[in-house]
Amino acid sequence: MRPLRMVAPPGPEPLLRVRDVTLQYRSGSATVRATQNVSFDVFEGDRFVLLGPSGCGKSSLLKAVGGFLAPSAGSIELAGRTVTQPGPDRMAVFQEFDQLPPWKTVLENVMFPLLAAGRLPRAEARERALHWIARVGLTRFAGAYPHTLSGGMKQRVAIARALAMQPKVLLMDEPFAALDALTRRTMQEELTKLWEEAPFTLLFVTHSIDEALVVGNGILLLSPHPGRVRAELNSHQFGLASGGSAEFQAAAQRIHDLLFDEAPAAPAPGERATR
């Protein structure tokens, strides 16, 4: 009798699959190569961070995932479909405070994409918007206009507006970079709390090593211009309370070395280095 052979069930498919993506754009009369042969996977419920120095193509990759910049080589797939244009399944939050139409109240800003997409009748859009406004702690300000809000409050509105659309992926391009240090930490805490209450898939861009470690459960390290993958590592063991620990500081130094050394060191366990 032949012995039984146990076959492991297949693992989950990535929600977002980026394969060998090279991005180029025009700047005056020149063609600028932002990234070269970048590949990574993001699974449902991941908090995946793109980390690297200024000019490494992080924001360009986010634009490409959003459908605003077409790859000159490679492919991007979301839920098994090639990304060719923007869509409501990808919502973005930027660092600029003027991303909210100033003539609309907080409630109207959060309702706007729901109504524009034709997804919900006005009454249901209002109910969902109020739910997300409450989730980010701004119920008292539902009738306020953006010019009356602080920078952190405006970012909360932008996050509520994006999550109200229930996107497959939330795209965040250095959303807290323009905030003071205390507000930035508060926003990191609130984003983490929102994810813990109801996990969503996050693709987050930053040039802060500490922020990458506390926000992400996975980090892709990109080399200086043009952006190439230096390494990919897990950071699920860290949180906002980890900042002073020896393990956190060692991880931060390791990332710094991988990003900026001319010849990156061999990867530590749990890392994947790429040349």
Predicted regions, residues:
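Helix-to-loop junction immediately C-terminal to a conserved catalytic motif
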Residues: 66
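Conserved ABC ATPase signature
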Residues: 145-149, 153
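Conserved ABC ATPase "signature" region
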Residues: 122-141, 193
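Conserved ABC transporter NBD signature motif
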Residues: 74-86
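Short coil-to-helix segment of the ABC ATPase nucleotide-binding domain corresponding to the Q-loop/switch region
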Residues: 103-112
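A short, proline-enriched helix->beta-strand linker immediately N-terminal to the Walker B motif
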Residues: 164-168
